[in-house]
Curated annotation (Swiss-Prot):
It comes from Arabidopsis thaliana (Mouse-ear cress). This is Probable protein phosphatase 2C 59. One of its GO terms (biological process) is defense response to bacterium. SUPFAM superfamilies: PP2C-like. Protein phosphatase that modulates defense response to pathogenic bacteria, conferring resistance and promoting salicylic acid (SA) accumulation. Interacts with the Pseudomonas syringae pv. maculicola effector HopW1-1 (via C-terminus). It catalyses: O-phospho-L-seryl-[protein] + H2O = L-seryl-[protein] + phosphate; O-phospho-L-threonyl-[protein] + H2O = L-threonyl-[protein] + phosphate. Belongs to the PP2C family.
Amino acid sequence: MGYLNSVLSSSSQVHSDDGPVSGGGLSQNGKFSYGYASSPGKRSSMEDFYETRIDGVEGEIVGLFGVFDGHGGARAAEYVKQNLFSNLIRHPKFISDTTAAIADAYNQTDSEFLKSENSQNRDAGSTASTAILVGDRLLVANVGDSRAVICRGGNAIAVSRDHKPDQSDERQRIEDAGGFVMWAGTWRVGGVLAVSRAFGDRLLKQYVVADPEIQEEKVDSSLEFLILASDGLWDVVSNEEAVGMIKAIEDPEEGAKRLMMEAYQRGSADNITCVVVRFFSDQAGGIGSSSTNIPIDHGIVPDRISGDSST
């Protein structure tokens, strides 16, 4: 277990309302690299957070990546960023039953956030789109409308579903719980919230749950890369466009920056956060093999978008 101490790494996000930040890391055993880019975009405040983390659990090296898009302020997204993955890796079944551990960690984090805030930040909530790498397994979980897309065999494949109130099953769940969905510029829970699942949202908690949908993918030679992003990207860039834009960009940090800048240039009105994880073709043993993974964090590098006039 001694070697695990040398591989623990986490992004140290600077929450900045001033301009874009980016960074990334590389596993020394050549299994994967990752990059992130985040910008307030045209907004004057920043409610997006991200997390990139390498950790050791029961002798296994795991990668944890997430994008958290806040609403009603930044507090809920910040809390989820700080606590979700810690709760997950402490779960006693994290390795033996990862899917159950993820579901429990999501709900534990939601419950603890609501308790910690008491009656404060009653409108604060957050989406989450997360990817967990354990050996040759990739588990993607989400609540809300931050999306995960993979490139497998050259094709863009969504591996998460946006949780919107007008989806028939989501609307039925909300109505069965005593809530309602109505049109107010877009379909909203209680005429207020445009996502049907989220962390926080105390006043709507009976209807807006933090139960994640989880999808598992095998990490093999056909899996090229993963994109996690807030809706600041997906509102203006399709899954296929996003994959096509960065397919030839080997550096995932540069790929994340490319997506962020494209969304800004297309007029995205929201904060924009992207995480890209690129897998290499030799996947024998997955990322948790006995070779030591030492991420090389490039750090957070300010990189203002040309012509940025954040408002």
